[in-house]
Amino acid sequence: MELTEKKKTEGQMIITGLICAVLFGVGWFALPILTEKILLGVVLLLAMGALFLTGSTGRYICKRILLALLTVFIIAAITFFTMNAIPGGPFSKEKAPSAAVQAVLEERFHLNEPVGRQFILYLEGLMQGNFGISTKTGREISTTIFESFGISAKLGGFAALLAILLGVVLGSIAALNRAKVADRVIIFFTTLFVAVPSFIMATLLLLVFCLQLNWFPIFSTDNQSYVLPVIALMLSPMSYITRLTKTSMLDVLGQDYIRTARAKGVKQGLVIFKHGLRNALIPVITYVGPMTAYILTGSMVVESVFTTGGLGTKFVQGITNRDYPMIMGTTIFLATLMVTATLLSDLVYKLVDPRIDFD
């Protein structure tokens, strides 16, 4: 049986190597005659074909990549046609431009084309990393997104890191002190933080710490400007991770192998951290994807409350200014990040627990 599996693995490796060789050959010889888009499609298909033959994990990754691409496409389609269905247009303002200027603007932004043609042109731009041009500023959306994303990435990164660290620590404390004062206090506050939306928490933090206590400036460009937005973003996911860690920890500590380790005289700290906490973190890892989605969507409103100048601020400004390319670009960009984060969290889940079989 083992010999058969070994031969099967060797055969998969040989086929994968051949496909990689073909992939290199296609890329080398087809470059002068194929357009960039066709070459990109061929390379992607061949790479996924090679990955598909590497085993159950490779097939799972291929399926998830295809599903991710389909999801982003559907979101792009819904966003595009929703923007086109809204009454008026990006240039429908109180002081409308003259007919000549209106015609020039419509031609520049392809608004004089049929909706189907506009969608095809928009998809072609997305394939090349081009999100269009802002109807408000005239700048490329991709440039604005990547300039603003640095701020959003810092806020989201700090919020996610603190949420995971504090959530795991508080959840472990609650599990080890079940039904005691520490457990009840932690569960009370985590329930409260889960129930309060991030934008309300952001407003409360602004009122208390900026206007009442004057601990932080309302408008700031230094590191102080990150403190309150990070707290507003991390409280809810931290609370959820705390409750998740507590439940998982209690379940793991009740397993037979934990009781066996304690019976053999293994130190309590070693039992908890080496055997208990490691297995208790598996559900937390699966929550990383949804947590990323929560932080990204929550940052849109939180950033506008604190005027941090991040991607969320640009998104809200796009809505206010009827800047449709900005709205579509930020929506698709954030959707891509969410899909990618969910895929990566599933793969990390597999690495942490090798027993998971994707078949």
Predicted stretch roles:
Residues 5-12, 52-67, 166-205, 282:
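Cytoplasmic-entry segments and transmembrane alpha-helices of multi-pass inner-membrane transporters
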Residues 22-38, 47, 51, 158, ...:
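Generic hydrophobic transmembrane alpha-helix motif, especially the helices
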Residues 59, 149-182, 198, 221-359:
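Alpha-helical transmembrane segments of integral membrane proteins
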Residues 70-120, 214-228:
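Hydrophobic alpha-helical transmembrane segments of membrane transport/permease proteins
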Residues 112-168:
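An internal, D/E-rich "acidic patch" concept
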